[in-house]
């Protein structure tokens, strides 16, 4: 691809392409100067030419191809011919690179040193204004990717109807903690409107998930009877564990009941609890709540 921009004819094509870039803004003299001082290079797909955290300071003009901009490994933007990357280094060369840039496909670039770029911008001062406008636009793009910080961490607690007294105890135990514990019965799922859409919305809003296991049903295996969890609780917990990960999805199981758990939950760290009806119920379940509180506070809000 780079051959198209080499030689006399290629140089003419290169100047014409660069003239249309946003920062150049149809100034052929500026385009010719950047071509003269810059290095024409080809970056194969998948090769990083700007690394986040590096102290390099070159500015790159995309002539052909497509690149991804990644921050902490996450793709935050794509850039195309007509765009440039690395301009922040021209404004403050002492700062490390704020993002990595990786070609999605074979890409042709013009690399211009910070010194040469700054000298060209001094000759054409409106370049600085265009850089400011470009960075303002990109900041607005980045803001769309930032999730508003909730005032409190949100913990979603799910259970069967039979286990609701246990859930009530958990909600009471966490009433004064710096996180919000929400039970499925409290306006999350309405019996007449139980849909996966509602469940998905709760997945997005929650930082942690807690499933209270209870011997609701009996499973007969090889003539043996085992207490087991309701299928809907397993479904809900599986979805939360898939979205939040094992560090943010906790299964509470009764200490004195040998529950038959699905094989998919094998190896999951569980929190045993004791539930004894009566005036001492809170005291019996307090150790399990203390362990759960410790895990939640240690992990904090999700990213």
Swiss-Prot record:
Catalytic activity: NAD(+) + H2O = ADP-D-ribose + nicotinamide + H(+)
Gene responsible for this protein: pycTIR
Major localization listed first in the record, in broad terms: cytoplasm
Region of interest called TIR-like, as start-end residue ranges on this chain: 154-273
Top-level taxon of origin: Bacteria
Lineage, top ranks: Bacteria, Pseudomonadati, Pseudomonadota, Gammaproteobacteria, Lysobacterales
Functional summary from the UniProt entry: Pycsar (pyrimidine cyclase system for antiphage resistance) provides immunity against bacteriophage. The pyrimidine cyclase (PycC) synthesizes cyclic nucleotides in response to infection; these serve as specific second messenger signals. The signals activate the adjacent effector, leading to bacterial cell death and abortive phage infection. A clade B Pycsar system. The effector gene of a two-gene Pycsar system. Expression of this and adjacent uridylate cyclase XpPycC (AC P0DV28) confers resistance to bacteriophage T7. When cells expressing the Pycsar system are infected by phage T7 at low multiplicity of infection (0.2 MOI) the culture survivey, at 2.0 MOI bacteria enter growth arrest. The same cells enter growth arrest after exposure to 2.5 mM cUMP but not cCMP; the effector protein responds only to the cUMP usually produced by its cognate NTP cyclase.
One of the record's GO cellular component terms: cytoplasm
Domain notes: Has an N-terminal cyclic nucleotide-binding domain and a C-terminal Toll/interleukin-1 receptor-like domain (TIR) that probably has the NAD(+) hydrolase activity.
Protein name: Pycsar effector protein XpPycTIR
Annotated Pfam families: CAP12-PCTIR_TIR (PF10137), cNMP_binding (PF00027)
BP GO terms, sorted: defense response to virus
Alphabetical list of PROSITE patterns matching this protein: CNMP_BINDING_3
Record-listed E.C. numbers: 3.2.2.5
GO MF terms held by the record: NADP+ nucleosidase activity; nucleotide binding
Localization annotation: Cytoplasm
């Amino acid at each position: 691809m780079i051959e198209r921009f080499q030689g006399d004819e290629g140089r003419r094509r290169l100047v014409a392409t660069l003239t249309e870039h946003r920062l150049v803004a149809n100034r052929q003299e500026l385009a010719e100067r950047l071509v003269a001082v810059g290095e024409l290079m080809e970056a194969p797909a998948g090769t990083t030419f700007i690394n986040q955290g590096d102290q390099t300071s070159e500015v790159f003009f995309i002539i052909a191809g497509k690149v991804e901009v990644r921050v902490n490994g996450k793709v935050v933007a794509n850039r195309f011919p007509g765009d440039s990357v690395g301009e922040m280094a021209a404004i403050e060369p002492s700062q490390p690179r704020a993002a990595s840039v990786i070609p999605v496909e074979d890409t042709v670039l013009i690399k211009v040193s910070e010194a040469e770029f700054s000298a060209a911008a001094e000759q054409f001062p409106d370049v600085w204004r265009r850089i400011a406008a470009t960075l303002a636009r990109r900041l607005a793009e980045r803001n769309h990717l930032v999730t508003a910080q909730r005032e409190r961490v949100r913990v979603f607690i799910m259970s069967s109807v039979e286990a609701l007294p246990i859930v009530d105890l958990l909600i009471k135990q966490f009433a004064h903690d710096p996180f919000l514990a929400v039970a499925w019965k409290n306006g999350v799922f309405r019996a007449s409107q139980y849909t996966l859409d509602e469940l998905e919305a709760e997945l997005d809003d929650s930082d942690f998930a807690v499933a209270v296991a209870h011997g609701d049903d009996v499973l007969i295996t090889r003539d043996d009877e085992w207490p087991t969890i309701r299928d809907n609780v397993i479904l809900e917990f599986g979805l939360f564990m898939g979205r939040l990960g094992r560090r943010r999805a906790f299964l509470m199981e009764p200490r004195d009941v040998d529950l038959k758990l699905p094989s998919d939950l094998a190896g999951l760290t569980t929190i045993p609890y004791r539930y004894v009806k009566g005036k001492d119920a809170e005291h019996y379940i307090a150790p399990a709540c203390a362990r759960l509180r410790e895990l939640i506070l240690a992990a904090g809000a999700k990213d």
